[in-house]
């Protein structure tokens, strides 16, 4: 078991002792270890994805609320920008 390797000779080991030992080994603060776990990273990614989804939904709603002429103007600008990027890449 990992606890036996980290703290030999102890029949029971507290999680705090293990965290402190690992933190000392890697020269980091034990309190910051919990912030950098794979689960917390997954949580950050999930929050970012959710925020981007909300932003996209708000953008779509604002776009749909625009008058038709303004939408056409935006679309023509996007097309012109894409066309310029493509022609620049193929030089």
From Swiss-Prot:
Instruction: Report any Pfam family annotated for this entry.
Output: Ribosomal_S24e
What domain of life? Eukaryota
| Coiled coil spans | none
Q: Which InterPro entries match?
A: Ribosomal_eS24
GO BP terms: namely: translation
| GO molecular function terms listed in the Swiss-Prot or TrEMBL record | structural constituent of ribosome
Which UniProt keywords are given for this protein, alphabetically ordered? Ribonucleoprotein, Ribosomal protein
Q: Region (Disordered): which ranges?
A: 51-91
Q: May I have one GO cellular component term? A: ribosome
Q: Is the Ribonucleoprotein keyword given for this protein?
A: yes
Belongs to which family?
Answer: Belongs to the eukaryotic ribosomal protein eS24 family.
The molecule here is called: Small ribosomal subunit protein eS24
Q: Which organism is it from?
A: Caenorhabditis elegans
